[in-house]
Amino acid sequence: MEKTKTKQGENEHMPVNNPSTQIYQLQALASELKTGFTEAMQELSRIQHGEYALEEKVKSCRCSMEEKVTEMKNSLNYFKEELSNAMSMIQAITSKQEEMQQKIEQLQQEKRRESRKVKAKKTQKEEHSSQAGPAQAQGSPFRSINIPEPVLPSEDFTNLLPSQAYEKAQESRSVHVGDSNVKGMMGPGVNPTTPEAEENLKSCLSADIQSKGHLPSGMWRQPKDGKEWGEEYVTKDHPDKLKEAGQGRHSSLENVLCETSLAAKRQTVALELLESERKYVINISLILKIKATFQGSDGKRNSKERSLFPGSLRYLVQQHLDLLHALQERVLKWPRQGVLGDLFLKLTNDENNFLDYYVAYLRDLPECISLVHVVVLKEGDEEIKSDIYTLFFHIVQRIPEYLIHLQNVLKFTEQEHPDYYLLLVCVQRLRVFISHYTLLFQCNEDLLIQKRKKLKKSSMAKLYKGLASQCANAGQDASPTAGPEAVRDTGIHSEELLQPYPSAPSSGPAITHLMPPVKKSQQQQSLMESMQPGKPSDWELEGRKHERPESLLAPTQFCAAEQDVKALAGPLQAIPEMDFESSPAEPLGNVERSLRAPAELLPDARGFVPAAYEEFEYGGEIFALPAPYDEEPFQAPALFENCSPASSESSLDICFLRPVSFAMEAERPEHPLQPLPKSATSPAGSSSAYKLEAAAQAHGKAKPLSRSLKEFPRAPPADGVAPRLYSTRSSSGGRAPIKAERAAQAHGPAAAAVAARGASRTFFPQQRSQSEKQTYLEVRREMHLEDTTRFCPKEERESEQTSFSDQNPRQDQKGGFRSSFRKLFKKKNGNATGEDFCGPWGWW
């Protein structure tokens, strides 16, 4: 029973399990079918998209091919039109040539008739006249212009272009015919060595406009179908109609004449361009030769000296060589319509880097010029440096020269010419390039011209030294003018003699600079001694020795270059006090020269001296001395007549000069800068305050001076020695007492006393704000003043402990400074009488 029950249970469960598995299987099949169907649909859509893309590509290719085909058709049609126009023009020209040949033949016939008539009249006059000489002179019309009797070879006239004959007949009826014009206007089958054809044609045209006695019996008859020749048969009885016929013939040839003359002029301009390019390539090849000699002479030079020449130079040389070959091929095989614009269009194209390399050359040139100056100065060969400057200048000027040449070619090019548009584009490109880099061009040109002038002056200085040594050896008197033999011996170019130094006003001291050369040590010693402070006679002697016109920007060139660099720091140091003794009758010119002498001794210090020195504050105006030492005439010379360079023995009179630090003084743009006369930098600058006052009065901007300055004596005392007034350079003058207190806190009581003393002396108005920071230059100046106080007597240092200012009136009531001031000058001057001493600025 149990077995049967289990079998029945299994049978009952079997139909229940089978449908579920079938359902699962069906669901799996359905999902598989669904995924396969979606994949098939995706593949189908992908195929459809690919077909669409292919169809679009095919359509685009078809459109592009159709456009190209239409363009080709249009170009072919345009080419056909051009060919048809050219054929029509050729046919018109050939027809005109045939007409002109016919006219020339008719002219030959008429001339033969005329010559026969002239010969007949000549024979008649010879028979009836007793003097054969005058009869011959009057009979032939060719005798007056020295033309031989015409022999008419008709085969030469048939090939002659009509434009030559009529152009020559219109311009001048003379024998002077240029060979170039004859060759340029002849046809291909013409022999240019047949002057009979020209002479015959000229004589026949001159015979047409002669007087009535030589009129021909008849003229040629023009065919009825001619457009420009409509005159009828002209007889001997109608001379007016003969003249009109001649004018009609000349007017008909204007077009041919104009075209031929323009072509000839255009060819000559192209030849000029080729010749200039040939010379230019020769010049720049010389630069490469000089570069090779510089690099080969010394292999141990550093990289800076090896870059004496711009790196783009070799590329530019190659480009100009290619251009020269192309121009030779074009110009020497010049066709009827020569084309040059495509060469320059390719040269100035953006793909070609010619203009970029040219700009790189212009930018590298100033540094290369400075290196050339240093290296050649070291080697001592100035002729090579002169040649290098000249060749550099040629390269700078080449692009403007191209513009001029192309404009000349464009001037003689018609608008219908195929080269017209190309030349127009090239000219426009060059104009834009030159206008864009005008400043670069101008800077390089000015630099090269300036270097060339300085080189000529230095070579003239060497020439003078050589002449002086020759004169010293020969025992003869030195002469400032150089002979040709001396010039030849010294190796100076003849063109450099054209710009010598002008002679000095006084003939005696003018020859003092013609001195034999000495050793370097002696030159250095003499130069340094000349820069040290001395007597006025020494300064005057040096001023006369190095005297030159003030218009020259370059300083004297008589010092060696190494000494010039070493001697630069001499005049820029602090200048101590000096005791000058000069007579009151010293002329103003000597004083001016003595004041100008130390600045004249400075060599070319443009690269070593900063662009502006420390300002002078005076009367609301600020004066500054620029670096190139700009000379200015004295504003009021009468103020200097009573001035003496003698110095008082006061330790308060200090005149020193320090250059401005740009890093420190760059934040002061509110002060206007005005040039100060050069004598303010000299050791003998005792009258510099007078110069400031004179300049301010001349400009009409000077404020009223203080009472103490007005009380200063202008005339010298009885003993002939006047106290000297220096221009104070103390930056602490004219400031608030806060400035002095700040200086006292920073540098101690001694510096505070010195700063306060400087503040009491000054009469300048307050220019700067109190919140302005103390610069490094002011700190150094106060330290310098602090050093000077160590040499003062003990009583003076004790009296300086009392700080005061002219803006604080309470200090004046105490009288501490006045008493110490009196004690100081009583002790130093030995004033035993006890008189009240009046300082250089009067009582405060």
Swiss-Prot record:
Annotated stretches, region: Disordered: 1-20, 101-142, 169-189, 498-541, 668-687, 702-745, 787-844
Domain of life: Eukaryota
Pfam families per record: RhoGEF
Residues in DH domain copies: 265-440
Modified residues (Omega-N-methylarginine): 757
SS bond partners: none
Keyword Coiled coil: yes
Gene3D superfamilies the UniProt entry points to: Dbl homology (DH) domain (1.20.900.10)
Biased composition (Polar residues): 130-142
Listed Basic and acidic residues bias regions: 1-13, 101-113, 787-800
Biased composition (Basic residues): 820-829
Key words of the record: Coiled coil, Guanine-nucleotide releasing factor, Methylation
Molecular function per GO: guanyl-nucleotide exchange factor activity
Coiled-coil intervals: 54-129
Record protein name field: Rho guanine nucleotide exchange factor 33
